[in-house]
Amino acid sequence: MTSSSVLVINSGSSSIKYQLVDPETGDAIAKGLVERIGDPMGFIKHVYGDAVTEEELPVPDHTVGMREVLRLFDTEGPSLAEAGILAVGHRVVQGGRYFDGPALITDEVRNLIEELCPLAPLHNPAHLKGIDVARELMPDVPHVAVFDTAFFQQLPARSALYALETETAEKYSVRRYGAHGTSHQFVSQEIAKLEGRDDLKQIVLHLGNGASVSAVKNGKPIDTSMGLTPLEGLMMGTRTGDIDPAVVFHLQRVAGMSVDEVDTLFNKKSGMKGMTGESDMRSVWDMIHNDDDPEAQQRARTAMDVYINRLLKYVGSYTAELGGLDVITFTAGIGENDAAVRRELAEALAPFGVKIDVEANQVRSGEPRVVSTPDSAVTIYVFPTNEELAIARQALTFA
């Protein structure tokens, strides 16, 4: 049992995910989740060592959910008193222009997070529920907000600003905020350590159901694909990614769709799911290789071509912005586990001297690894992200 730890909380609209982290080793001492908050019957899972506890019980609100989390630590272990919690780190999606790093949660900081809810209406209100309850139930430890957008507050104006009327943009805080910043910062810093140099020109591909790209030069971000919201950029599991904004007006005029209907279409019914009916990449690959319906097979292959092509566009443009490229890193669920996506992108980059080691690329491992050949012009890494550890380390600065 460690004598010092950080409790990391990610509070969603109907869930609480948590992890007790040893910030020195990076080990998850215990972890779990509370799901279906507000439904007639909720679900709780707590993992400590080899012991897995699962329960179904009513969880009417986040207060009850957080109390159940603390109960499970008491009954199933580890005791939070023995774990020596030094801080509680809260994931917060949107920090706006206010936060370029982690922040000790005071009443003032809490109110600023609330003020930013219009920029992240699905996320910040849910984070606040978890923050308010956790501060009430654990008042004797520092609570720290770690923002997904903080890393990208360093973006140069040429990348952060849209070509929108300045007065309107400033009045309504319209600019590129990015997302997945905690992951992009963590991965790019760890790659710099592995390479033994800080003057790297890096592209980080955070590829999960939500996906984003960042260009990092000398440890600083110079561009990223997500924008005002996480909708912009790459094709994703259910999101369009980049799309002509006039499509919104077109659908309103010819289909009679409301703003909310277009929002739902773009965010929840598009991307891979919209083009193939499946949001999971494993299912899409299965359609490509095994589907008996030639039309479905072709739709899936076309969707994958669009996905790879969007990646290729961003890698190409970011390489130009960086003035060259030393490292490409794949991370998150698809980036870490989908060898075919990595191979197809690398093959598309072959004219620029990028060479993937086919055997190394096929190896499944939870460890950081190089999957390019020794003579590749760019080193390709697969690096497991660890946002919980990153949040824990940032929270620890206030302990």
Indicate residue ranges for each PLM-predicted region.
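Short glycine-rich, Thr/Ser-proximal phosphate-binding strand/loop in the N-terminal lobe
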Residues: 6, 15-59
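Conserved phosphate-binding/catalytic loops in two-lobed NTP-binding clefts
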Residues: 339, 343-387
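Phosphate/ATP-binding catalytic cores across multiple sugar-kinase/actin-like superfamilies
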Residues: 187-190, 194, 305-323
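Glycine-rich phosphate-binding loop of actin/hexokinase-like ATP-binding domains
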Residues: 151-254
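A mobile "lid/hinge" subdomain adjacent to the ATP/sugar-phosphate binding pocket shared
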Residues: 255-303
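Short beta-strand-loop/turn "lid" adjacent to the catalytic site in phosphate-handling enzymes
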Residues: 73-123, 144, 150-161
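General beta-strand structural signal in soluble alpha/beta enzymes
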Residues: 90, 121-125, 142-147, 153, ...
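Glycine-rich beta-strand-to-loop/alpha-helix junction loops that act as flexible
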Residues: 11-12, 90-95, 207-209, 325, ...
